[in-house]
Protein backbone atom coordinates (compact mmCIF):
# COMPACT_ATOMS: atom_id res chain seq x y z
CA UNK A 1 0.00 0.00 0.00
CA UNK A 2 2.85 2.37 0.86
CA UNK A 3 4.53 1.67 -2.48
CA UNK A 4 1.27 2.40 -4.32
CA UNK A 5 0.89 5.68 -2.41
CA UNK A 6 4.43 6.78 -3.27
CA UNK A 7 3.92 5.78 -6.90
CA UNK A 8 0.68 7.75 -7.07
CA UNK A 9 2.32 10.78 -5.49
CA UNK A 10 5.23 10.63 -7.93
CA UNK A 11 2.86 10.29 -10.89
CA UNK A 12 0.92 13.33 -9.67
CA UNK A 13 4.13 15.33 -9.31
CA UNK A 14 5.30 14.29 -12.77
CA UNK A 15 1.95 15.31 -14.26
CA UNK A 16 2.08 18.78 -12.68
CA UNK A 17 5.72 19.31 -13.65
CA UNK A 18 4.72 18.57 -17.25
CA UNK A 19 1.99 21.22 -16.93
CA UNK A 20 4.58 23.71 -15.65
CA UNK A 21 6.92 22.82 -18.51
CA UNK A 22 4.11 23.52 -21.00
CA UNK A 23 3.35 26.82 -19.25
CA UNK A 24 6.91 28.12 -19.53
CA UNK A 25 7.30 26.52 -22.97
CA UNK A 26 10.19 24.13 -22.30
CA UNK A 27 10.62 20.35 -22.63
CA UNK A 28 9.68 18.37 -19.52
CA UNK A 29 13.13 16.75 -19.67
CA UNK A 30 14.66 20.01 -18.40
CA UNK A 31 12.62 19.86 -15.17
CA UNK A 32 12.65 16.09 -14.70
CA UNK A 33 16.10 15.88 -12.97
CA UNK A 34 14.83 18.24 -10.24
CA UNK A 35 11.57 16.43 -9.49
CA UNK A 36 12.74 15.38 -6.02
CA UNK A 37 13.07 19.06 -5.04
CA UNK A 38 9.45 19.83 -5.92
CA UNK A 39 6.13 19.12 -4.19
CA UNK A 40 2.38 19.26 -4.74
CA UNK A 41 0.11 20.56 -1.98
CA UNK A 42 -3.62 21.06 -1.57
CA UNK A 43 -5.12 24.02 0.32
CA UNK A 44 -8.69 24.58 1.42
CA UNK A 45 -10.56 27.87 1.04
CA UNK A 46 -9.18 30.48 3.45
CA UNK A 47 -5.94 28.61 4.16
CA UNK A 48 -2.68 30.57 4.05
CA UNK A 49 -0.34 29.29 1.34
CA UNK A 50 2.62 31.39 2.44
CA UNK A 51 3.57 34.53 4.29
CA UNK A 52 6.77 36.22 3.18
CA UNK A 53 9.52 36.92 4.04
CA UNK A 54 9.43 33.91 6.38
CA UNK A 55 8.44 31.58 3.55
CA UNK A 56 9.93 33.25 0.47
CA UNK A 57 12.23 30.40 -0.53
CA UNK A 58 9.73 28.79 -2.95
CA UNK A 59 8.09 29.62 -6.26
CA UNK A 60 4.58 28.24 -6.79
CA UNK A 61 2.62 27.17 -9.85
CA UNK A 62 -1.14 27.38 -9.32
CA UNK A 63 -2.62 24.22 -10.78
CA UNK A 64 -6.23 24.69 -9.74
CA UNK A 65 -8.25 27.32 -7.89
CA UNK A 66 -8.15 31.04 -7.10
CA UNK A 67 -5.79 32.91 -4.78
CA UNK A 68 -5.27 36.41 -3.44
CA UNK A 69 -1.80 37.80 -2.79
CA UNK A 70 -1.71 40.84 -0.50
CA UNK A 71 1.54 42.78 -0.73
CA UNK A 72 2.33 45.15 2.16
CA UNK A 73 4.87 47.96 1.77
CA UNK A 74 6.71 49.88 4.48
CA UNK A 75 3.96 52.50 4.63
CA UNK A 76 1.31 49.92 5.39
CA UNK A 77 -0.29 50.17 1.95
CA UNK A 78 -1.84 46.98 0.58
CA UNK A 79 -1.61 45.91 -3.06
CA UNK A 80 -3.78 42.97 -4.04
CA UNK A 81 -3.08 40.46 -6.79
CA UNK A 82 -5.76 37.98 -7.83
CA UNK A 83 -4.83 34.84 -9.73
CA UNK A 84 -6.50 31.78 -11.17
CA UNK A 85 -4.97 28.48 -12.27
CA UNK A 86 -2.01 28.40 -14.65
CA UNK A 87 0.09 31.13 -13.06
CA UNK A 88 3.59 31.19 -11.55
CA UNK A 89 4.05 33.25 -8.38
CA UNK A 90 5.64 35.16 -6.69
CA UNK A 91 8.20 36.05 -9.34
CA UNK A 92 8.65 39.82 -8.96
CA UNK A 93 11.82 39.37 -6.87
CA UNK A 94 13.18 36.36 -8.75
CA UNK A 95 16.19 38.14 -10.25
CA UNK A 96 16.92 40.50 -7.37
CA UNK A 97 16.06 38.66 -4.14
CA UNK A 98 14.75 40.92 -1.40
CA UNK A 99 12.36 40.68 1.50
CA UNK A 100 8.76 40.89 0.35
CA UNK A 101 5.91 41.14 2.83
CA UNK A 102 3.25 39.22 0.96
CA UNK A 103 0.40 37.11 2.30
CA UNK A 104 -1.00 34.51 -0.09
CA UNK A 105 -4.39 32.97 0.73
CA UNK A 106 -6.56 30.42 -1.05
CA UNK A 107 -9.84 32.03 -2.13
CA UNK A 108 -11.16 28.63 -3.20
CA UNK A 109 -9.84 25.11 -2.72
CA UNK A 110 -6.45 25.11 -4.46
CA UNK A 111 -3.73 22.80 -5.69
CA UNK A 112 -0.21 24.17 -6.14
CA UNK A 113 3.14 22.89 -7.32
CA UNK A 114 6.09 24.24 -5.34
CA UNK A 115 9.74 24.42 -6.31
CA UNK A 116 12.76 26.20 -4.79
CA UNK A 117 13.20 29.80 -5.93
CA UNK A 118 16.93 29.17 -6.28
CA UNK A 119 16.18 26.33 -8.70
CA UNK A 120 14.07 28.56 -10.92
CA UNK A 121 16.74 31.28 -10.85
CA UNK A 122 19.36 28.68 -11.81
CA UNK A 123 17.23 27.41 -14.70
CA UNK A 124 16.79 30.99 -15.95
CA UNK A 125 20.54 31.50 -16.00
CA UNK A 126 21.11 28.18 -17.75
CA UNK A 127 18.36 28.46 -20.36
CA UNK A 128 17.64 31.61 -22.38
CA UNK A 129 14.12 30.45 -23.30
CA UNK A 130 13.15 30.10 -19.63
CA UNK A 131 14.61 33.52 -18.85
CA UNK A 132 12.68 35.20 -21.67
CA UNK A 133 9.44 33.50 -20.65
CA UNK A 134 9.85 34.48 -17.00
CA UNK A 135 10.76 38.04 -17.96
CA UNK A 136 7.55 38.31 -20.01
CA UNK A 137 5.53 36.90 -17.09
CA UNK A 138 7.05 39.48 -14.74
CA UNK A 139 6.03 42.24 -17.16
CA UNK A 140 2.48 40.84 -17.24
CA UNK A 141 2.48 40.84 -13.44
CA UNK A 142 3.52 44.51 -13.36
CA UNK A 143 0.84 45.39 -15.92
CA UNK A 144 -1.77 43.75 -13.70
CA UNK A 145 -0.53 45.86 -10.80
CA UNK A 146 -0.73 49.01 -12.94
CA UNK A 147 -4.28 48.26 -14.07
CA UNK A 148 -5.37 47.74 -10.47
CA UNK A 149 -3.85 51.07 -9.44
CA UNK A 150 -5.48 52.85 -12.38
CA UNK A 151 -8.87 51.48 -11.36
CA UNK A 152 -8.42 52.99 -7.90
CA UNK A 153 -7.69 56.47 -9.29
CA UNK A 154 -11.22 56.86 -10.67
CA UNK A 155 -12.91 59.90 -9.15
CA UNK A 156 -16.40 58.42 -8.95
CA UNK A 157 -17.20 55.37 -6.84
CA UNK A 158 -19.30 53.72 -9.56
CA UNK A 159 -16.50 54.02 -12.12
CA UNK A 160 -14.13 52.53 -9.57
CA UNK A 161 -16.38 49.53 -8.97
CA UNK A 162 -16.87 48.98 -12.71
CA UNK A 163 -13.14 49.15 -13.40
CA UNK A 164 -12.48 46.72 -10.57
CA UNK A 165 -15.00 44.32 -12.09
CA UNK A 166 -13.14 44.68 -15.40
CA UNK A 167 -9.81 44.07 -13.67
CA UNK A 168 -11.13 40.96 -11.93
CA UNK A 169 -12.62 39.61 -15.15
CA UNK A 170 -9.25 40.03 -16.86
CA UNK A 171 -7.31 38.32 -14.07
CA UNK A 172 -9.59 35.67 -12.55
CA UNK A 173 -12.63 35.66 -14.83
CA UNK A 174 -13.62 32.74 -17.05
CA UNK A 175 -14.67 33.79 -20.55
CA UNK A 176 -18.19 32.54 -21.31
CA UNK A 177 -18.85 34.24 -24.68
CA UNK A 178 -21.14 37.17 -23.76
CA UNK A 179 -20.00 37.43 -20.16
CA UNK A 180 -17.27 36.56 -17.70
CA UNK A 181 -17.78 34.24 -14.74
CA UNK A 182 -16.09 35.04 -11.43
CA UNK A 183 -16.05 32.32 -8.80
CA UNK A 184 -17.82 32.45 -5.45
CA UNK A 185 -15.00 34.12 -3.49
CA UNK A 186 -16.07 37.61 -4.62
CA UNK A 187 -18.15 39.47 -2.02
CA UNK A 188 -19.50 42.99 -1.69
CA UNK A 189 -17.23 43.45 1.33
CA UNK A 190 -14.17 42.52 -0.73
CA UNK A 191 -15.22 44.93 -3.49
CA UNK A 192 -15.69 47.74 -0.97
CA UNK A 193 -12.28 47.01 0.59
CA UNK A 194 -10.61 47.08 -2.82
CA UNK A 195 -12.37 50.26 -3.91
CA UNK A 196 -11.81 52.08 -0.62
CA UNK A 197 -15.50 52.85 -0.17
CA UNK A 198 -18.12 51.78 2.34
CA UNK A 199 -19.85 48.43 2.03
CA UNK A 200 -23.18 50.27 1.76
CA UNK A 201 -21.98 52.33 -1.21
CA UNK A 202 -20.47 49.30 -2.94
CA UNK A 203 -23.67 47.33 -2.39
CA UNK A 204 -25.80 50.15 -3.81
CA UNK A 205 -23.65 50.40 -6.95
CA UNK A 206 -23.65 46.65 -7.51
CA UNK A 207 -27.44 46.60 -7.05
CA UNK A 208 -27.70 49.24 -9.80
CA UNK A 209 -25.55 47.11 -12.09
CA UNK A 210 -27.79 44.13 -11.36
CA UNK A 211 -30.87 46.19 -12.29
CA UNK A 212 -29.15 47.08 -15.57
CA UNK A 213 -28.52 43.35 -16.21
CA UNK A 214 -24.78 44.00 -16.34
CA UNK A 215 -23.98 41.93 -13.27
CA UNK A 216 -25.82 38.78 -12.18
CA UNK A 217 -25.32 36.63 -9.09
CA UNK A 218 -25.76 33.03 -10.28
CA UNK A 219 -25.93 30.94 -7.12
CA UNK A 220 -22.55 31.83 -5.55
CA UNK A 221 -20.74 32.83 -8.73
CA UNK A 222 -20.87 36.20 -10.50
CA UNK A 223 -21.70 36.72 -14.16
CA UNK A 224 -20.41 40.01 -15.58
CA UNK A 225 -21.63 41.18 -18.98
CA UNK A 226 -18.97 42.28 -21.45
CA UNK A 227 -21.15 45.32 -22.19
CA UNK A 228 -19.97 46.65 -18.84
CA UNK A 229 -16.52 47.16 -20.38
CA UNK A 230 -17.55 49.42 -23.25
CA UNK A 231 -16.34 52.81 -22.00
CA UNK A 232 -14.56 52.66 -18.67
CA UNK A 233 -12.50 49.49 -18.54
CA UNK A 234 -8.77 50.16 -18.14
Swiss-Prot record:
It is found in: Cytoplasm. Residues 188-207 bind DNA. A nucleoside 3',5'-cyclic phosphate binds at residues 40-129. InterPro entries: cNMP-bd_dom, cNMP-bd_dom_sf, RmlC-like_jellyroll, WH-like_DNA-bd_sf, WH_DNA-bd_sf. Pfam families: cNMP_binding. The keyword Disulfide bond does not apply. Coiled coil: none annotated. One of its GO terms (cellular component) is cytoplasm. One of its GO terms (molecular function) is cAMP binding. Residues 155-228 form the HTH crp-type domain. Positively regulates the expression of the arcABDCR operon under anaerobic conditions, thus playing an essential role in arginine catabolism. May also control the expression of genes encoding proteins which are involved in anaerobic metabolism. Can bind cyclic AMP. This is HTH-type transcriptional regulator ArcR. It comes from Staphylococcus aureus (strain MSSA476).
